[in-house]
Swiss-Prot record:
Required for incorporation of 9(10),16-dihydroxy-hexadecanoic acid into cutin. This is BAHD acyltransferase DCR. It comes from Arabidopsis thaliana (Mouse-ear cress). Its EC number is 2.3.1.-. It is found in: Cytoplasm, Cytosol. The keyword Magnesium does not apply. Disulfide bonds: none annotated. Residues 211-233, 452-484 are annotated as: Disordered. The lineage of its organism: Eukaryota, Viridiplantae, Streptophyta, Embryophyta, Tracheophyta. GO terms for cellular component: cytoplasm; cytosol.
Length: 484
C-alpha cells in the first residue's frame, strides 16, 4: 500500500478553556499506563466522488472535520491536554490553554490514491490498514510527551479512512464512543452536543496513588500460557480474523444456551453471556487442551452502574475493571453452551461495588503498572462491546462501511466485540489466536453454525463419558492479580 502523509497539524478547542484544569488519574485509569494507545479504524465510502477531488476534499471534507473537532474539544478538553505527574509520582491529566507545551490533538492528512474501500474491508487482519492508524506500538505512558489523541484521515480512491489512537489511561470504550458520536454530531451541523461529558474523576475514586515508574526491559513482551515464565521459548505466530455472527446466528446461540433450565434458578443468559460462552468453548476445543487444563475467561466490564454511588453513563474516563473466571477445559467441552454461560454469568453477577472497592484497595496498597503480559492461562479475553453504536458515527458523508480495532493491545486469546454492520443483534467478533488454532476454528462447522454441524466435538477433551477430574463445580475464581 502506497501512502503519502500530506500534512500534520494540531487542533485545540476553538474557544480556549479558561484556567488550568487538572484531574488526577484514578485507580480505574492508572493500570492502563502500561497498555498501548487504543486504536480505532473507521472506513467510509463516498457516494459523491467529486468530494474526493481537490481542493474540495481539503477545503470542505478535511476542514469540516477539523472545525468540528475544535468545537467538540471545548467539551472534551481533556483529550486536548497531556499527562503529567508530580514529584511523588501522582499522575494527572491536565489542560491549560496558556501552556505552550500542550499542542492539542494531532491531526494528519494522508493520500492512498490506489486503495479502494473494498480493498480494506476484505482484509481479515490489521496488517493491511496498519499504516492508516497512528501510534502503533506506543505506550499510554508516552502521553507525558505526546498528544492524548491522534487522528489520521486518509483519502482513498472512493472514500475515506479514519484512524484514531486514544490514550487508554485517559478514557475507556464508553467515553471513546461518546466522544466520537459527539464529534460526528457537530460535523453534521449541530450547534452543540446532545450529551455533555461528566468530567470529575474524583467522584468515582478520590485517591492519590504514588507510582514507581520503572519501565520494563521489553514493554512489547507479551505471553499467554505455559511458556509465560520461560523467556527462551519462541512466541507463537498470531493471526487475526473477523467472525461475523448474523442476527439469526446470535439468536440461535442464545436459544441453545437457554434451552437447558439452570438448576440454581439463575437468570436467563444474556446475548453476551451466550455468545462469549460459545466462542470460549470452541477456542478451547481448537487449542486441543488436556481435560484437566485450566482456561480463563476475562471480560473488561463497565462499572458505571456497579460502583456505589453509581456514576452517570456520561462519566469521562476509565470506569472498567477486569472480571476473571475459569474452569477445566474438559468441563467446558463436555457440556453445552449453558455451562460456560453460567460460569460467566456468576462471575459478572458477583462483581458488585464491594468487590470493585476491594480490588481497588488491594491495587492501591501495591500498585503494579507494567502488567501487560498475561490475561490468564489459556485465556479468552473480551474488550469493546456490541452496545456501542459504532455504525451511527456519521460525519456527514454517511455511516461507516466497517469499524475495527487497530493492531495495538492484541495477544493470544484477545477478542473485540462490535455491533454488526448487518443490524439487528448481529455481532462482529475480532479475535487473535495462534495460527494453528485459528485454522481449526475456521473449519469448525459448529462454531460457524454451518448447516452440517460437527458432532461430538466435545469428546476431544473428555475421558469418554463426558467427565473430567474437576473441583466439584469446575469454577476457577479470579483473584484480581491478573490482567488489568
Amino acid at each position: 500500500m502506497k501512502i503519502k502523509i500530506m500534512s500534520k497539524t494540531h487542533v485545540k478547542p476553538t474557544k480556549p478553556v479558561l484556567g488550568k484544569k487538572q484531574f488526577h488519574l484514578t485507580t480505574f485509569d492508572l493500570p492502563y499506563l502500561a497498555f498501548y494507545y487504543n486504536q480505532k479504524f473507521l472506513l467510509y465510502k463516498f457516494q459523491n466522488l467529486l468530494d474526493l477531488e481537490e481542493p474540495t476534499f481539503q477545503n470542505e471534507v478535511v476542514e469540516n472535520l477539523k472545525d468540528g473537532l475544535g468545537l467538540v474539544l471545548e467539551d472534551f478538553y481533556q483529550l486536548a491536554g497531556k499527562l503529567a505527574k508530580d514529584d511523588e509520582g501522582v499522575f494527572r491529566v491536565e489542560y491549560d490553554a496558556e501552556d505552550s507545551e500542550i499542542n492539542g490533538v494531532e491531526f494528519s492528512v494522508a493520500h492512498a490514491a490506489d486503495v479502494t474501500v473494498d480493498d480494506l474491508t476484505a482484509e481479515d487482519g490489521t496488517a493491511k490498514f496498519k499504516e492508516l492508524v497512528p501510534y502503533n506500538g506506543i505506550l499510554n505512558l508516552e502521553g507525558l510527551s505526546r498528544p492524548l489523541l491522534a487522528v489520521q484521515v486518509t483519502k482513498l480512491k472512493d472514500g475515506l479512512a479514519m484512524g484514531l489512537a486514544f490514550n487508554h489511561a485517559v478514557l475507556d470504550g464508553t467515553s471513546t464512543w461518546h466522544f466520537m458520536s459527539s464529534w460526528a454530531e457537530i460535523c453534521r451541523g449541530a450547534q452543540s452536543i446532545s450529551t455533555q461529558p461528566f468530567l470529575d474523576r474524583s467522584k468515582a475514586r478520590d485517591t492519590r496513588v504514588k507510582l514507581d515508574l520503572t519501565a520494563p526491559k521489553d514493554p512489547n513482551e507479551t505471553s499467554n500460557g505455559e511458556d509465560a515464565a520461560n523467556p527462551t521459548v519462541e512466541p507463537p505466530q498470531l493471526v487475526e480474523k473477523i467472525f461475523r455472527f448474523s442476527d439469526f446466528a446470535v439468536h440461535t446461540i442464545k436459544s441453545r444456551a437457554n434451552s437447558v433450565i439452570p438448576s440454581d434458578s439463575s437468570k436467563p443468559f444474556s446475548t453476551f453471556q451466550s455468545l462469549t460462552s460459545h466462542i470460549w468453548r470452541h477456542v478451547t476445543l481448537a487449542r486441543g487442551l488436556k481435560p484437566e487444563d485450566i482456561t480463563i475467561f476475562t471480560v473488561f466490564a463497565d462499572c458505571r452502574r456497579r460502583v456505589d454511588p453509581p456514576m452517570p453513563e456520561e462519566y469521562f474516563g476509565n470506569l472498567i475493571q477486569a472480571i476473571f473466571t475459569g474452569t477445566a477445559a474438559g468441563l467446558l467441552a463436555a457440556h453445552g453452551p449453558e455451562f460456560g454461560a453460567s460460569v460467566i454469568q456468576k462471575a459478572i453477577a458477583a462483581h458488585d461495588a464491594s468487590v470493585i472497592d476491594a480490588r481497588n484497595d488491594e491495587w492501591e496498597k501495591s500498585p503494579k503498572i507494567f502488567q501487560f503480559k498475561d490475561a490468564g492461562v489459556n485465556c479468552v479475553a473480551v474488550g469493546s462491546s456490541p452496545r456501542f453504536r459504532v455504525y451511527e458515527v456519521d460525519f456527514g458523508f454517511g455511516k461507516p462501511e466497517t469499524v475495527r480495532s487497530g493492531s495495538n493491545n492484541r495477544f493470544n486469546g484477545m477478542m473485540y466485540l462490535y455491533q454488526g454492520k448487518a443490524g439487528g443483534i448481529s455481532i462482529d467478533v475480532e479475535i487473535t489466536l495462534e495460527a494453528s488454532v485459528m485454522e481449526k476454528l475456521v473449519k469448525s462447522k459448529e462454531f460457524l453454525l454451518s448447516e452440517e454441524e460437527e458432532e461430538d466435538d466435545g469428546k476431544k477433551l473428555t475421558n469418554g463419558n463426558g467427565h473430567v477430574n474437576g473441583n466439584g463445580n469446575g469454577y476457577v475464581n479470579g483473584n484480581g492479580n491478573g490482567f488489568v
